[in-house]
Amino acid sequence: MQHLRPIRRALLSVSDKAGILEFAKALVERNVELLSTGGTARLLAEAGLPVIEVSDYTGFPEMMDGRVKTLHPKVHGGILGRRGQDDTIMEEHDIRPIDMVVVNLYPFAKTVAHPDCSLADAVENIDIGGPTMVRSAAKNHKDVTIVVNSNDYEKVIEEMDNHQNSLTLDTRFDLAIKAFEHTAAYDSMIANYFGQKVAPYYGDTSQPSGTFPRTLNLNYIKKQDMRYGENAHQQAAFYIEENIEEASIATANQLQGKALSYNNIADTDAALECVKSFSEPACVIVKHANPCGVAIADTLTQAYDNAFKTDPTSAFGGIIAFNRSLDAKTASAVIERQFVEVIIAPSINEDALPILATKPNVRVLACGEWQEAKPALDFKRVNGGLLVQDRDLGMVKEENLRVVTQRQPSEREWKDALFCWKVAKFVKSNAIVYAKNDMTIGIGAGQMSRVYSAKIAGIKAADEGLEVAGCAMASDAFFPFRDGIDAAAMAGVTCVIQPGGSIRDDEVIAAANEHNIAMIFTNMRHFRH
């Protein structure tokens, strides 16, 4: 049963007026009476549409600079009145049924995002009447339609045309859910903003805020359900942020292949965020959230070839990310050489698509171009709580780099050291990366002791016949003992880049000098757990 409800009267009051004029015209053409307020009413009247000001309907003027517009029983009675149950009381008080409410709220997020926003500015952009009408209409969705998103205007008109100016209960219920999500997100923004304020300062300028709110309110939109989670016995879904500003796995458009799995998404994110660190043509191959091969080169194909050489065994069934549009030559190299789960790039050249289509199960994603990384929060759930930190966007600056050994790095060693330092940031701790001539030659990831990560990196290089002699080594954190340097020297490393800061730095530096290794301190750690 559809539980149709006809639309005879609608109240329109929107801050974002995109599409509202066309929507209002469509309603008038379908004999819907329009009620409206403030700027929305003026817009409709200037367009020649018949509209009744809410103040004329209620007999009560807007007041207090617009703070009080719709907070009146004749408005909320018309929205909340239950058809067939409250009709007598509505008639007694001349309350007319309002069948549709079209509302979106004051632009609070846009206001507080401005660097000069004061607390007073923020307060004036807290909508009161809007959320009240939205929640009232959503509560009474059995009889009333609530529309909070302009993307739904066309859908509403189409359904009215299909049902003699009526809407189904399924549609009203779906729109009510969107409405509650809308007001929840709005209240969360306000709570987060006020929760960061250290004092009720009402000056004309913005006030310094705390980093984190007292109560953390998060709103994410479900993009897709997964077949299962990290393991087959776990259920999972993928949620994304609203209004994403940075190219990412969340913005990616899948061009071909099977549905992305939970692990695909996690690994693709790791690969993409790593490859975005490089300005030169670059390729990153990831397996189980760790880079197993990274390279930069003059061409994308050469970058892929060199990244693959690091660890061909681990690259099998991996995730491959590029920071340039994927061309046909590089696509051919990948498809002809290896089994791959996911390929992601800013875009895919037209001539590469038929080549990729020969392997229809390969997931191919285009995420769009990116500029600089945006500040954001990272989360890690622990049992009973949530760890929150700002995103690791730390970049070493030249003035912070310090050579602490007797020997200075050569120009080639400098370049390789800075290259593998970028990679180490994206390797699970304890992380050790060997690099030479713009490519990784060995990666030691996730070991409980740093010296074993160093040994593993050397073993990886030896297994693939890659020459370690003269290479650079990066460590994501300081060496607590000299044994890591001794292991690196034994493998053939000639330059080390690491944060420094151990109580045994002198011992570690002495070991580097003994082995004639150049060592650079960055004064920045990049743990990744």
Swiss-Prot record:
Keywords: Hydrolase, Multifunctional enzyme, Purine biosynthesis, Transferase
MF (Gene Ontology): IMP cyclohydrolase activity; phosphoribosylaminoimidazolecarboxamide formyltransferase activity
EC number assigned by the record: 2.1.2.3, 3.5.4.10
Record field: transmembrane: none
Functional pathway: Purine metabolism; IMP biosynthesis via de novo pathway; 5-formamido-1-(5-phospho-D-ribosyl)imidazole-4-carboxamide from 5-amino-1-(5-phospho-D-ribosyl)imidazole-4-carboxamide (10-formyl THF route): step 1/1; Purine metabolism; IMP biosynthesis via de novo pathway; IMP from 5-formamido-1-(5-phospho-D-ribosyl)imidazole-4-carboxamide: step 1/1
Catalytically driven reaction(s): (6R)-10-formyltetrahydrofolate + 5-amino-1-(5-phospho-beta-D-ribosyl)imidazole-4-carboxamide = 5-formamido-1-(5-phospho-D-ribosyl)imidazole-4-carboxamide + (6S)-5,6,7,8-tetrahydrofolate; IMP + H2O = 5-formamido-1-(5-phospho-D-ribosyl)imidazole-4-carboxamide
Cited SUPFAM superfamilies: Cytidine deaminase-like, Methylglyoxal synthase-like
InterPro entries given in the database record: AICAR_Tfase_dup_dom_sf, Cytidine_deaminase-like, MGS-like_dom, MGS-like_dom_sf, PurH-like
Pfam families, sorted: AICARFT_IMPCHas (PF01808), MGS (PF02142)
Annotated GO CC locations: cytosol
Domain MGS-like: 2-148
GO term, biological process aspect, one: 'de novo' IMP biosynthetic process
Protein family membership: Belongs to the PurH family.
Domain notes: The IMP cyclohydrolase activity resides in the N-terminal region.
Annotated protein name in UniProt: Bifunctional purine biosynthesis protein PurH
Organism this protein belongs to: Proteus mirabilis (strain HI4320)
Lineage, top ranks: Bacteria, Pseudomonadati, Pseudomonadota, Gammaproteobacteria, Enterobacterales
